C-alpha cells in the first residue's frame, strides 16, 4: 500500500486487479495500517504512511482523489446532500462522512502513538461530526440538505435491500445509524442513555432491519456488550446469525464475501472475539463455537508465543458465557485489548444454557 502511494501519490481506496476502481466510501488505508501499527506490526515505513494519510485528510476536495467531498466535511463537520452527487438517487453523503469519521479517529490514534498531539486532537474532534446527522425525530442518522435542514420526507427504512436512498450507500438509515464504533458512548448519549440505546438496537434485530448480507451493520451484534449486563444479547444474536446464515451449503454465506469480509466475520465470531473498531486494537468477546483454537503468531512480533482460545461448550444450546479467564486470571470485562490478548495468551470460556 505504501509502495502504491510512492508510485502515484495516493493510498489505495478500492484496488482491484492491480487498478484503482474508486468504488465505495472513505479513506480505508488509514484504519488498516493504523490497526497493524498499533498491534505491533511495524516492519514498514510508518512516517511515509502518515505522510500519505495527512495528504488525503487535508488536501482540498477538488484536488483530493481519496476524499473529493472533504471541503464541507472540514468546514461544517458533515457532507450535505447534493454536494458531490447531483443525482439524489446516487448521493452517498452520509455513508461517505461516516467512513471519514472512522478514518479520522484512526488517524487520531496513530498521531497520538507517534507523539503528534495537535494532530491527534484535530482528527479526534473531526471524527465526532456524526452528531450533526442524528435526528431525534426519527431516532436515526438522517441526510442533511444544503441549507442545513434534515431531508424531508424521510423514511429510515428506505434503502434496504440495495434500493436507492439519498445519503446512504447499499443500505438504510437503520443499517448505518449504529456505525459509530469509535464513539459508542457518545451515540448512547444522543439516543437518551444506555437503556434507550439497547432498546433501539434490539428493535433493529427484532424487526428485520439488520442486514446480515452486507457490511455497514456487520458489527451491530457486538454493540450490546458495550452496556454492562447486556452482553447476553451479543451472545444470543451472534449465535443466531451464525446458525441461520453461515452453513456448509453452496450458498453458505448470506451475501457477497467482499474480499473475505463475511467469512472473516464468521471466523472471528466462531472463535469468540471480534475486532470492534477499525484502527483501535480491541476485541469484543462472545461465546466461541470451537472447544479449542490455536492462533500461531509470528515470534518476530509476538515472542511470548501462540494464543489458545478454549471453551467447555459441549452443546449448541450453551449460548451464554458464565465466566472467562485470560492468562489464568478471571476476566470481568467483555472487551479486551490486543496487547492483553497477546500477553495473556490463554483465553478460556466457561458457558451455560
Give the positions of each predicted feature.
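Membrane helical hairpin/interfacial module
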Residues: 17-23
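Active-site-surrounding "flap" and adjacent substrate/cofactor-binding loops of secreted or lumenal enzymes
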Residues: 1-16
